C-alpha cells in the first residue's frame, strides 16, 4: 500500500494541537501492512512526539534496503538513557514527573504491529537534541512468476484414442 497519503492524513489529524509538523517523504513508497495498522502506528508515534516534544516535529519517510524507513523526531528533552532499552515494553512511561498522560501501551502497540508485519521499531536520542522514533517496514515483494515448461502436442496423449495393442 502507498504510505504517503496515510502519512499526510495522520499528520493532518494532529494539526489542531498547534504543533509545527513538517513532512518529507519520497514519492511512491509502498509497504506491506494493513492500512489500519499503519494508521495506529503513525498516530501513536506522532502522539508521543507531541506529548514529549516542544511542538516542533519532523516526519520523514524514505526507501532503504528493501524497506521503508519512517522517522518521527521531536525537539524536546529526548529519552532518559535508562528508558531507551525498554521504550517499547508494555506499561512503560517515559516521564511521569511531567504529569504525562497515557497507559504506557502506545509504543508497545507500535512495536507489536511493526513486528507482525515483518518490520521493527527503535527509539534513539538525536545528537542535536530531541527523541526520534524510527519504524522500518518491508516493501512488497514483486509477484512471483514461474516459467512453466512448454508442452507440445507430441508431449500429450489423446485419452480418446484407442490404445494400440498391435505389439502385444
From Swiss-Prot:
SMART domains: HATPase_c (SM00387). Pfam families: HATPase_c (PF02518). Residues 143-168 have a biased composition (Basic and acidic residues). Member of the three-protein two-component system HK1/HK2/TcrA. Kinase that binds ATP and catalyzes the transfer of a phosphoryl group from ATP to HK2. One of its GO terms (biological process) is negative regulation of phosphorelay signal transduction system. Interacts with HK2. The lineage of its organism: Bacteria, Bacillati, Actinomycetota, Actinomycetes, Mycobacteriales. It comes from the Bacteria. HK1 and HK2 are merged into a single protein with a distinct N-terminal sequence in strain CDC 1551 / Oshkosh. It catalyses: ATP + protein L-histidine = ADP + protein N-phospho-L-histidine. One of its GO terms (molecular function) is protein histidine kinase activity. Residues 1-141 form the Histidine kinase domain. SUPFAM superfamilies: ATPase domain of HSP90 chaperone/DNA topoisomerase II/histidine kinase. Its EC number is 2.7.13.3. InterPro entries: 2C_sensor_his_kinase (IPR050980), HATPase_C_sf (IPR036890), His_kinase_dom (IPR005467), Sig_transdc_His_kin-like_C (IPR004358). This is Sensor histidine kinase component HK1. Residues 137-168 are annotated as: Disordered.
